[in-house]
Regions:
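Short, isolated positions in well-ordered beta-strands
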Residues: 53, 244-245
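Electropositive, surface-exposed helix/loop patches at the edges of structured domains
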Residues: 254-264
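Acidic, low-complexity/disordered tracts enriched in E/D and polar residues
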Residues: 1-65, 122-143
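Short, well-structured beta-strand/strand-turn elements
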Residues: 216-229
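Long, charge-rich, low-complexity alpha-helical segments
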Residues: 51, 55-157, 161-170, 216, ...
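Secondary-structure boundary elements
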Residues: 125-201, 208, 214, 238-239, ...
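A short, glycine/Asx- and small/polar-enriched loop/turn
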Residues: 230-234
Length: 264
């Protein structure tokens, strides 16, 4: 009996030791997971499914240490109490099981885009934008691409396509002026009114606009931002500090969680 009891204790100790090692594996946000911190915690966007996961602030001190490519906090979250290591490791294990975290090394995301300070005005470009019909084919191709893939499980492929197109624009180092961008924005707005409304369709509209500009070799940034209390997600397109399809005041109420384009 003593021998069996000793064996059981040794076996239990081995299991606990193994569990401890497993729990402390180096972790990374996976390639399709995007994260940002807010005052009351963090939000993770799981791009493969389009799902958002909320993380309470009490877990953040441990996650910042354990997840190697966790975004810079900049002291955004207000942490008053910390979760225990056991609780934090349980959360990490759950995120690994869901594919949100991985043990395979993944790079840290590049810096967030500049905060928009104004909406891009198009008044001076209206007369010089040309006939919208000359841009119709590029508009239709962009609209068609987004329409076919505008589902939560296809968002990753759209973001990937946009990233590739913007990377090619940066690689050839083509210089596009703000006037070029204004002309294309005017053409886009004139064409959009015949095909769909952007009301309550910020994600759809922003994807179509970003792809249209990319086809026209205009560097831009597609952004998804989030806020809490209540939770909201919003999408927009910007060039530098100018937002193209919203107001600066509105987008400033959101924290960018994903940015693809000129600033990345």
């Amino acid at each position: 009996m003593q021998h069996n009891s000793l064996s059981q204790r040794n076996g239990q100790a081995a299991v606990e030791a193994c569990s401890e090692v497993t729990a402390r594996r180096t972790c990374f946000l996976s390639a399709h997971s995007y994260c940002c911190e807010l005052e009351d915690g963090a939000i993770i966007l799981e791009l493969a499914t389009g799902a958002y996961v909320g993380i309470h602030a009490e877990y953040l001190p441990h996650l910042r240490i354990r997840i190697q490519n966790w975004p810079d906090s900049h002291g955004s979250a207000q942490v008053t109490t910390n979760a225990t290591i056991t609780e934090s490791e349980s959360l990490i294990s759950s995120l690994v099981d869901r594919g949100i975290l991985t043990t395979s090394p993944a790079p840290k995301r590049s810096s967030t885009p500049p905060t928009p300070v104004a909406a891009m005005t198009t008044g001076s470009a209206i007369q010089r934008s040309g006939t919208p019909a000359k841009h119709l084919m590029q508009f239709m191709m962009s609209l068609w691409t987004v329409s076919l893939r505008h589902r939560d499980d296809q968002l990753a492929s759209l973001v990937g396509l946009l990233s590739q197109r913007q990377h090619l624009i940066r690689r050839v180092q083509r210089t596009a002026t703000l006037e070029d961008a204004k002309k294309m924005l005017v053409a886009f707005l004139r064409l959009r009114i015949w095909f769909y409304t952007a009301d309550r369709r910020c994600l759809f509209d922003s994807l179509v606009l970003a792809l249209f500009l990319s086809r026209k070799k205009i560097p831009c940034t597609f952004v998804i931002g989030v806020s809490t209390k209540p939770f909201l997600a919003h999408a927009w397109v910007q060039i530098g500090e100018f937002v193209l399809n919203d107001t600066a005041e509105h987008v400033q109420t959101f924290t960018p969680i994903l940015a693809v384009g000129e600033s990345n």
